[in-house]
C-alpha cells in the first residue's frame, strides 16, 4: 500500500544554501518533517549547480513524517537576466528596452528549461522563452 500524502510544499531555494531558517524551516516544521534531513539532501542534490541560483522544489510530505522532493529548472526570468547581464528587468517593457538577446542565447535557455516546458519542440520552447524576454524589456533577435 502506498504512503498517505498529507501535503505538498512548493519553495524556491538557492542552490546549495538550504538552511533551517525561513522559508524552509517553518514550511517543513508545520508538516512535522525533519528540516535538517531535507536541507542536507537538497544541498547534496544541488552541489553541482551554480551556488545561489534559485531552484524551485516541490516537497511531498507523507503521513509517516517522511518526504520526497522534486527539483525543477531555475525560473526563466533568472536565466534571462543572467544571459543579458542584468540585475532586473524593465519597469516599462514596451518603451524602455534594457538589453538584447540572440537566438543562440534563447536556444541555450530553452534547452535548460525544456523538462519543465510544455512546448512540443525546441522552436516552440524558444518562442516561449522569447515571450518572457520581451515581457522583461529585452530585445530578441532572430525570433518572430
Curated annotation (Swiss-Prot):
Keywords, ordered alphabetically: Methylation, Ribonucleoprotein, Ribosomal protein, RNA-binding, rRNA-binding
Membrane-crossing residue ranges in chain numbering: none
Tagged with keyword rRNA-binding: yes
Any Gene Ontology CC annotation: cytosolic large ribosomal subunit
GO biological process terms, semicolon-separated: translation
InterPro entries the UniProt entry points to: Ribosomal_uL11, Ribosomal_uL11_bac-typ, Ribosomal_uL11_C, Ribosomal_uL11_C_sf, Ribosomal_uL11_CS, Ribosomal_uL11_N, Ribosomal_uL11_N_sf
Processing and modification events after translation: One or more lysine residues are methylated.
PROSITE patterns for this protein: RIBOSOMAL_L11 (PS00359)
GO MF terms, alphabetically ordered: large ribosomal subunit rRNA binding; structural constituent of ribosome
Cited Gene3D superfamilies: Ribosomal protein L11, C-terminal domain (1.10.10.250), Ribosomal protein L11/L12, N-terminal domain (3.30.1550.10)
Listed SUPFAM superfamilies: Ribosomal L11/L12e N-terminal domain (SSF54747), Ribosomal protein L11, C-terminal domain (SSF46906)
Function field: Forms part of the ribosomal stalk which helps the ribosome interact with GTP-bound translation factors.
Family: Belongs to the universal ribosomal protein uL11 family.
Assembly mode: Part of the ribosomal stalk of the 50S ribosomal subunit. Interacts with L10 and the large rRNA to form the base of the stalk. L10 forms an elongated spine to which L12 dimers bind in a sequential fashion forming a multimeric L10(L12)X complex.
Protein name, entry field: Large ribosomal subunit protein uL11
Amino acid at each position: 500500500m502506498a504512503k498517505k500524502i498529507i501535503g505538498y510544499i512548493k519553495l524556491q531555494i538557492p542552490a546549495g544554501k538550504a538552511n533551517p531558517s525561513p522559508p524552509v524551516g517553518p514550511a517543513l516544521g508545520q508538516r512535522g518533517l525533519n528540516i535538517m534531513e531535507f536541507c542536507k539532501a537538497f544541498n547534496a542534490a544541488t552541489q553541482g549547480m551554480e551556488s545561489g541560483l534559485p531552484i524551485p522544489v516541490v516537497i511531498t510530505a507523507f503521513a509517516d513524517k517522511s518526504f520526497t522532493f522534486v527539483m525543477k529548472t531555475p525560473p526563466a526570468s533568472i536565466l534571462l537576466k543572467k544571459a543579458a547581464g542584468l540585475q532586473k528587468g524593465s519597469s516599462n517593457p514596451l518603451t524602455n528596452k534594457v538589453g538584447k538577446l540572440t537566438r543562440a542565447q534563447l536556444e541555450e535557455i530553452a534547452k535548460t528549461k525544456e523538462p519543465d516546458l510544455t512546448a512540443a519542440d525546441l522552436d516552440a520552447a524558444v518562442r516561449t522563452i522569447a515571450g518572457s524576454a520581451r515581457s522583461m524589456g529585452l530585445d530578441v533577435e532572430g525570433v518572430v
